């Protein structure tokens, strides 16, 4: 689905289903440098099980026109604009990494629009290392390698992919190589600079990978302490890329959390 926001095209994957009034809505928000396809497996399930689905391409990513938005708050406001444009009063937000910060900020500042949030591979604060930021700033391909290697558990390149025919490293690199120069750096800086404003009152689910070296489970401890009550799922086998590394466990956690 393409919509027009501020004279720019924005794309949302809807699992090949038209949006229907009366159905609950779930919005999937990708991480830094990625696009809607990060949530391909999970979003498709909900689209075929009674939900309106919007798996978004943020501005400057995938099929949405740029430039990228420079702050998490601006991205959260943009997500709410999408809801406005589509006459969706309230939605569940599911975010991965940077997307989890967007969901978090939207829930804090636009509480009346957010029913629940699921935070996949979240850390707070989400400080990005200077070598990673610097490589992205220089549009150095080393930044893509850091994103890809740190973004998956160490066993991923050894095989055993739960999705037959999918090469996780290659898939990640292909998405990053499609980016315009500066987009990855903009995303990383926005994530690193983010400070939560306000409190979150809606139900919250944390889905964390035990083998995640980018946002290890302990890095969500401060945030979990600020949000009570919340639910927690830790996937022992997964690194940062939970949706691809552990698609079934991630989906099971979401299904249980979104059960109506």
Summary of predicted features, one role per range:
Residues 101-145:
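Flexible "cap/lid" loop of the alpha/beta hydrolase fold
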Residues 134-199:
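Conserved alpha/beta-hydrolase catalytic His-Asp/Glu region
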Residues 238-251:
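Catalytic histidine-centered segment of alpha/beta-hydrolase-like enzymes
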């Amino acid at each position: 689905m393409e919509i027009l926001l501020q004279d720019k095209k924005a794309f949302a994957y809807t699992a090949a289903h038209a949006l229907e009034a009366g159905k609950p809505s779930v919005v999937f928000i990708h991480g830094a440098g990625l696009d809607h396809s990060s949530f391909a497996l999970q979003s498709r399930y909900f689209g075929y099980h009674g939900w309106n689905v919007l798996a978004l391409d943020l501005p400057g990513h995938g099929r949405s026109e740029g430039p990228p938005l420079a702050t998490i708050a601006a991205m959260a406001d943009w997500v709410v604009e999408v809801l406005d444009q589509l006459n969706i009063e309230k939605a569940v937000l599911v975010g991965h990494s940077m997307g989890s910060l967007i969901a978090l900020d939207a829930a804090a500042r636009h509480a009346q629009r957010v029913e629940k949030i699921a935070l996949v591979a979240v850390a707070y604060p989400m400080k990005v290392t200077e070598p990673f930021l610097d490589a992205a700033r220089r549009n150095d391909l080393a930044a893509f390698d850091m994103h890809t290697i740190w973004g998956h558990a160490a066993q991923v390149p050894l095989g055993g992919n739960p999705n037959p025919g999918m090469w996780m490293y290659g898939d990640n690199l292909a998405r990053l190589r499609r980016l315009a120069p500066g987009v990855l750096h903009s995303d990383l800086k926005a994530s690193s600079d983010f400070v939560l404003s306000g409190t979150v009152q809606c139900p919250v689910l944390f889905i964390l990978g035990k083998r995640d070296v980018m946002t290890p489970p302990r890095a969500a401890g401060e945030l979990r302490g600020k949000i009570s009550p919340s639910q927690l799922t830790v996937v022992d086998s997964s690194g940062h890329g939970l949706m691809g590394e552990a698609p079934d466990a991630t989906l099971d956690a979401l299904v249980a959390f979104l059960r109506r």
